[in-house]
Amino acid sequence: MKKVRAIVSLLLALTLALSLTACGGQANSEPEQPETQEEQTAAEINLYVLSGPTGIGAMNLWAASDAGETKNTYHITMPGANDEVVAALSKGDADIAAVATNLAATLYNKTDGGVTVLAVNTLGVLSLLSNGQEAATVSELKGKTIYAPGQGANPEYILRYVLSGNGLDPDKDVTLRFVGEGSELLTVWQSDPEAVILAPQPVATSILMQNENAKTLFDMTEEWDKIAGGDSTLMMGCVIVRNEFLQANPGAVELFLQEYAASIEKARSDVEGTAVLCEQYGLIPKAALAQKAIPSCGLTFVTGAEMKTGLSGYLQVMFDANPKSVGGALPGDDFYYGA
């Protein structure tokens, strides 16, 4: 019996010792830290970016995300056409997308206000090129044939606006011929060496690099500004968000804007490095071409009231040219994030 009591006493002593040790450890441990604000708000984001200038601003973000250096986790897709972006946003496969500004307005109308524009990322990227011919003013293009991409989209309406602002009737004083893709412009002069070409970046840079006779006649951004006189700004590209995603993840959207702004700034300051990424991710075929084109790609980051003022004026011009260009109606004030 004494032996049993001794064993019981020993067990009780051990239990008490362990309890005291546990209590002591708990008292000395640091309280569990709450998640930081960034950790609480970060999210996985399905980001769609179109090829060309609209997508250049996302290249450094893409690389940073792949390296695990971003707060949000980005799954980036680069579709081949606007229709794929529209479908992805409609189905909820895309959360945020970099698109043309008139497409953003069209989506706003098609979805009954279901998307919001977060920032403008691209200004003017269009130039009128000739195969050696000279022209001092746009009005001197009367009688010329002008080849252009983007029928029914930004390029056509910008071209019409600039021609009309210089006293030319786009349907009578010049011959407009549209091509399906900007890359098709590379072969135009083989069949029509006297033609003038409306080329976006990086196609314009590629043409100038490959054809020693090619020259830039007019920068369309400069010509737009001469006509608009400050009433509107040529804003061709933007990033939009599905409102369902925005409402569910407001903090993640704010983080995106911070990380995206940094990506654009790096694209402007580190052109060579960004050009390498453009080739790596398949945005532009060759880094050498991208490096020459990026400084002319109108990269910017405009938000809030400044974005609303410039973009609403631009969309007004598009609407006046053809209401269908922006989806039949101008977007409401709720279209503009933070304005």
Tell me what each language-model feature is:
Residues 1-10:
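Bacterial N-terminal signal peptides that target proteins for export
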Residues 24-27:
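Bacterial signal peptide processing site
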Residues 30-178, 195, 201, 217-218:
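Short, glycine-/small- and polar/acidic-enriched structural segments
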Residues 60-62, 126-136, 233-251, 300-303:
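A bilobed periplasmic-binding-protein/Venus flytrap-type ligand-binding module shared by bacterial periplasmic
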Residues 102-103, 184-277:
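Pocket-lining segment of extracytoplasmic ligand-binding domains
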Residues 246-321:
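Secondary-structure end/capping motifs
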